[in-house]
Amino acid sequence: MSPNPTRGSMEQAFSGRAAEPPTMAALKARETKFLREHELCRLATASKDAKPHVVPVIYTLDGGDVVVAVDYKTRKLKNLRENPRVALVVDEYRPNRGLMLEGDCEIIERGPEYLRLLKILFERFEFYRKNPWGEGESPILKIRPTKAVMW
């Protein structure tokens, strides 16, 4: 067994196969505060053959989960269908502060949970309120952190 349950081999991290079932990392108050102060992160996904892909996305929080809306025809969504493991970074150049999260992503496309998360996104982002969508039009990613590193 690995000494740190959130760590595994690089192959396991990119293959979507965990050595052990990941556990949710409870975000500390300062990590949650930092995330709430920002709205843009860089989301990293990897395909089933471990080809990495990183893109900027806007996000909001739902408790300890990170919530992101995506389009259907994106590489990140294709990757997530093959491999639910993600990493994301929120950072500031000056002062040099940041937060890196690793976690597992659930793709939500319909149903009560979708509508609940959609409401949270609409409340946070005026752009989404002005350009609304509904079930089946744009998947929502719910990312459950399993590791957090702040600097």
Could you say what each language-model-derived stretch is?
Residues 39-40, 85, 126, 148:
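Generic structural signal for secondary-structure transition and capping sites
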Residues 38-71, 80, 87-90, 100:
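Short beta-strand segments
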Residues 74-76:
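Short, surface-exposed beta-strand-loop junctions and turns on beta-sheet-rich folds
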Residues 35-36, 81-82, 122:
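Alpha-helix boundary recognition
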Residues 2-26, 95-151:
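Charged, gly/pro-rich active-site loop segments
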Residues 72, 91-93, 145:
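Short secondary-structure boundary segments
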Residues 13-45:
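Short, conserved active-site entrance elements at the starts or edges of catalytic domains
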Residues 32-33, 58, 78, 131-133:
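Short secondary-structure boundary/capping segments
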